[in-house]
Amino acid sequence: MRICIFGAGAIGGFVAAHLARVSGLEVSVVARGAHLAAIRERGLRVVTPLGEFAARVRATDRAEDLGVQDLVFIALKQHQLPAALPALATLLGPDTTVVPPTTGIPYWYFHGLGGAHGGRQVDRLDPGGASWRTLAPERAVGCVYWAASTGLRLLGGHRGDRAGSDPPRRQAAALSDR
């Protein structure tokens, strides 16, 4: 089974890494910039309270190089979706299933509903109906991506105020790393 995760940030990378551990799945990601370079160089690394692992996946910034997929996970923020539709279209065949999570009401929300709002398309959710046409609602599987996290470790960078002083907040931040 060919699976593409379109958007390899925190959520997309997490999903891709776990799927890559399943035998028989051909997992690829569409990423860009520093994420793409890091994935190509080091793979995807997941650290959880139960352990950590690394996974290698095919990574590209050109979706059209991947060909038609059986399953496409869209791991973009909702406002990024319209610009990504042309690239997403290159991954879709007649039997491709799409998993398009969203942080709000999805474009396909009214698809298949009866009553006064059945099949309604809301321009505010899907300007011009582009998502509806490209990612036909009958191929969509609704879901919510959710991963619990209990902490964040700063691995580098500057802290403190712009003046370079050493206020109590900065001292507290430094102590929290120990």
Ranges and model annotations:
Residues 157, 163-178:
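Conserved anion/nucleotide-ligand pocket segment
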